Amino acid sequence: MTTLSHAAVGLLVTKFFVDRGWLPDATITPYILGVAFANIPDIDGLVSLRRVYDHHSALKNLSHYPANWFIVFGFVALLAIPFHIRYFYTYLGLATVNVFLHFILDTFSIYHGIAWFGPWNKKKYSFIRMLPIIPSDTHEWVHWYMKHWVLYLEIALWIVTLMVLLEHWI
C-alpha cells in the first residue's frame, strides 16, 4: 500500500480515538500524530528516496519487523513512567494500532509483503503478491501498480476516509 493509504487509516483510527474521548477533539494534533504514526514504519523510505519502490531494504527491513516496534514502544513506555505525561499512553496506543495496521496494509503488497516473524524468520507474507520480482525503478513499480486491483481498493479507502472526516468537520 502507499503512503496515502497509510495516512487514511491513520486518520480513521485517530477519529475513532477522538470520538471515544480518549484524545482531545479541539485540536488537529491527534490527527497529525495519527498520520505520522501510520507512516512511521516507512521511515526507511527517507533513507532510500531514489529507490522508494524498494525502501524496505534500505534499513535491512528493520522498520518492517513488527517485533522491533513492540520492543521500541515497550521501551518508550518504560522510560515515560516517571514523567506522568497527559495522554502519553493513549498516544502510544494510537501509535501501536497504526503501526500494526500499517503492517496489515503492507501484507496486501503487490510483491514480497511483510516478514511478520522477523528478524528471526525473514520469510515475507503477502496476501496478493502480483510481482515475482522487485521492480527495477519507481516508474516500473507505478506501471505495475496502476494495473492492479489494489489501486482501486486504495481509492475506495481514500473516499471513505474523506467522507468520514468531512462528516466530522462539517
Segments (PLM) and residue ranges:
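N-terminal membrane-targeting hydrophobic helices
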Residues: 1-170
